[in-house]
Amino acid sequence: MSVTGYDVRLRPAQPATPAADAFMIHHSDIGNGLELAYVREGVGGYPLLLIHGYPETKRIWWRNIEALVAAGFEVIVPDLRGHGDSDLSESDTYDLVTYSRDLYALVHDVLGHEHVGVIGGDVGGVVAVDMVHRFEGFVDALCFFDTVPPMVIDAYVAAGIDIGSIKAIADGPTGDYRRRQGGEPDVLAAELNSPALRRAWVAAMYGPRLWASPGTFSDADIDFMTEPWADEARLRAGWAVYQLGYGRAAEEFPILDRAVDVPTLLFYGADDQVVGPDFLHCCEVAFTNRVGPLVLAGAGHFLQWERADIFNPTVSMFFHSIASKV
């Protein structure tokens, strides 16, 4: 899509990235013998759950945590099972509903929150929508960006949206990763037979695969983001959601077939080449109580990192308005 005339060379400097060890990493058993790793800062504030996607870990939120804590929120930033510092699944169980149940167990059962605000993009956005519907009354409000929109197909057709145009579920010019990670993971894993090659595969998604706005991620940023993916088992865990479209079994289907009625702040990164601008039209239909979609120039798929200067204050204002009512 891009914003015509926007010069990314003039994009403001973004907040400094905290050191890799800037935040304490907690580990909690979520009741099934599996431990999730997470950052928890600002305890006592209104709770916000930040859910990463792929090829991400909790590190994608590093530029957001301090600002949201300073704004008065309790910020909970987990690694999904199999990702980052969280445990791998001994049963190789990785699917969207499992992620949803894991995070509910962490935030509700372990940390004791009866309700929460949720922020998610990519896989994290889909998990967030499932949580809205699956755990009624738990999610007060949502921030949703750059992911697969809810699949309210009849409503989209009625609104004149061409279902075939939804890029997030299509195979675009840089979309071979979907086929390879989903349909031939063993072949791909055999090719990526060293930590360096595995990191290079992920690094391309922060660079030449055009997920991000040009120049957003420095070499140091990419090193930081790819380090957790050097391990083959963790990279394979990240691929699991893509395999759901190629016959991988899931215990349950996520609840994505209905509109979202909770207050929702919507963003879209204008330079995203994974999720297309059809996302805007879909969100205007699927979210009945929305702010946005707000299109961010100079940002792509990882907009919380790429335009933290806009994301942090906007998210803070939105969730302050929610917290004042609950």
Regions found by a protein language model. Name each.
Residues V39-D85, G121:
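Conserved HGGG/HGGXW glycine-rich cap/lid loop of the alpha/beta-hydrolase fold
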Residues A299-N312:
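Catalytic histidine-centered segment of alpha/beta-hydrolase-like enzymes
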Residues S2-D29, L36-V39, P47, I76, ...:
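Flexible "cap/lid" subdomain of the alpha/beta-hydrolase fold that forms the substrate-access gate
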Residues T57-K58, V126, A299:
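A short, glycine- and basic residue-enriched loop/turn
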Residues W61-W62, G276-L280, W305-A308:
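Conserved strand-to-helix beginnings and helix N-cap segments that scaffold or border functional pockets
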Residues F318-V326:
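Short, hydrophobic alpha-helical segments
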Residues Y54, V148, F302:
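Active-site pre-Tyr helix/loop in NAD(P)-dependent dehydrogenases
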